[in-house]
Amino acid sequence: MKFKKGNRWTNGKGELRYKTWRTNVFKLNKGRHGLSKHYVCMKCNKKRKTTRTLHAHHIYSWEKFPNKRYTIKNGVVLCKYCHTGFHYKYKFEALENPNLLVEYIGKNKNSKTIREYIKNDK
């Protein structure tokens, strides 16, 4: 029997393993910025006290790189506006090319961190 993907299908993102990855990405974000009470969007650098309006984004896409799905360093924090903007601008190209995230974030210390991860991961 085949099952159809319904509107509640999450492609594994509802799993405890994914939620743990997401939590750890947020913790890493705080550490990168030397903060204890705030989270920071890596694009716009706005500080947030909660993760409610923040997303954990995969540098190497969830779809194309299943072996990197739960690697904590493969995650960055973007506010929902910057995250939506990234996917609107690059659409499916972003699935294949992690360097587009560096281009999108621009030249700041955050893009340097991502560039180093991509370079060291090859």
Model-derived features: positions:
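Short linker/helix segments within small regulatory modules
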Residues: 60-74
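Histidine-centered catalytic micro-motifs
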Residues: 54-62, 82-86
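Short Cys/His-centered divalent metal-binding micro-motifs
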Residues: 49, 75-97
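Short cysteine/histidine-rich metal-coordination sites, predominantly Zn2+-binding motifs
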Residues: 58-64, 94-103
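Short, charged surface segments at domain edges that flank catalytic/cofactor-binding sites
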Residues: 2-45, 67-69
